[in-house]
């Protein structure tokens, strides 16, 4: 909404801007649960879960303090998303003009498309945990990563803010089979789970294009990384000719050979995700994001120490006068079995 010079700004007008601001900075959809409906998903992608700006009553005078609640939240939001603008706060006694209102709307329009993006320098990586497996494995090794959020909405806020969960594998020591697995780990790269997708720092993976918003209580495949070695191809051809007539002799013969072979071992990493709600209810109580990393191959007696590193790339906290922005990281636990 654009205001013309001289237009009277009412409580209804103010509340409309507050609602748009809170939709991003706070949460207008607190009853969210996993959804498949595109409209519902689109709505639930809004919201960082911070303290809302105040809605005012009809007939209330729009004061500098009220307007500054909106301005402060938009300035923090613009900083976080890498926006183009920073608004000046209103001084007590200053007239609230149409120009100020239009500037606020401009900033909202700038921030909204980037609500799920954290600008460069607005996140920080921290290690949540390491799962090390050193007892060897045959054919299959499975890592279980449990990331506990106090509610489904807390998980939403984490991923809506542009925060991600990162996974990478490494090995120390071990036999030839372990060294082959180390090559697979390099191919896999660092995997990042975001709101809408699961990707890697390399191009060697097959993503299912699913992120946090796609997850529910059913386990789903998120990503695959394959490595195959070995193969052979052979081709042979021979020709001879002969015949005989009186004192002249000539011979004929023909030979042809063809061969093809494909051998070696296939090693594969698959990553799965699901959400586990307390007592099966997403609407109340804690929710665990479970990531399962499965290594499979024909290899037997793989030795060495194989470790899965789990990191949080979380939006950093920031403040601007009356507005404070903060995202809570999940509580980590992990295990492995072969």
Q: Which functions belong to the PLM regions below?
A:
Residues 96, 124, 132, 139, ...:
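Polar low-complexity intrinsically disordered regions enriched in Ser/Thr and small residues
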Residues 14, 104, 165-169, 193, ...:
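Generic structural hydrophobic/aromatic packing signal, biased to beta-strands
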Residues 1-130, 134:
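Extracellular "spike/adhesin" assembly and maturation modules
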Residues 172-183, 296-306:
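Short, surface-exposed beta-strand/loop "edge" segments at domain boundaries and coil↔beta transitions
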Residues 115-181:
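Solvent-exposed, flexible loop/coil segments flanking beta-strands in beta-rich domains
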Residues 155-157, 163-174, 182-187, 217, ...:
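Long, compositionally biased low-complexity segments
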Residues 205-338:
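Extended, charged low-complexity segments
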Residues 177-214, 337:
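Large, modular interaction/toxin scaffolds in secreted and membrane-associated proteins
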């Amino acid at each position: 909404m654009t205001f013309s010079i001289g237009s009277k700004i009412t409580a209804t007008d103010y509340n409309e801007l507050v609602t748009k601001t809170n939709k991003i900075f706070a949460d207008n959809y607190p009853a969210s649960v996993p959804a498949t409906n595109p409209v519902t998903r689109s709505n639930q992608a809004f919201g960082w879960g911070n303290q809302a700006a105040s809605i005012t009553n009809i007939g209330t005078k729009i004061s500098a303090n009220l307007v500054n609640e909106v301005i402060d939240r938009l300035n923090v939001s613009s900083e976080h998303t890498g926006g183009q603008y920073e608004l000046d706060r209103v001084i007590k006694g200053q007239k609230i003009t149409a120009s100020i209102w239009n500037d606020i709307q401009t900033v909202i329009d700038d921030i909204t498309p980037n609500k799920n993006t954290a600008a460069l320098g607005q996140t920080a990586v921290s290690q949540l945990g390491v799962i090390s497996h050193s007892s060897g494995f045959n054919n299959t090794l499975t890592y279980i990563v449990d990331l506990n959020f106090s509610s489904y909405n807390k998980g939403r806020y984490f991923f809506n803010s542009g925060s991600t969960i990162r996974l990478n594998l490494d090995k120390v020591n071990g036999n030839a089979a372990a060294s082959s697995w180390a090559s697979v780990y390099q191919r896999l790269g660092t995997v990042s789970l975001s709101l809408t997708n699961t990707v890697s720092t390399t191009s060697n993976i097959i993503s299912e294009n699913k992120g946090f918003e796609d997850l529910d209580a059913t386990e789903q495949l998120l990503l695959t990384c394959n490595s195959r070695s070995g193969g052979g191809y052979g081709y042979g051809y021979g020709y001879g000719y002969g015949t005989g007539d009186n004192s002249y002799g000539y011979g004929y013969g023909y030979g042809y050979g063809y061969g093809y072979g494909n051998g070696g071992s296939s090693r594969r990493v698959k990553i799965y995700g699901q959400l586990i709600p307390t007592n099966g209810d997403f609407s109340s109580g804690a929710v665990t994001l479970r990531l399962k990393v499965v290594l499979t191959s024909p290899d037997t007696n793989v030795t060495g120490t194989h470790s899965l590193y789990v990191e949080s790339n979380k939006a950093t906290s920031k403040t601007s006068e009356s507005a404070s922005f903060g995202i809570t990281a999940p509580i980590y636990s992990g295990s492995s079995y072969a």
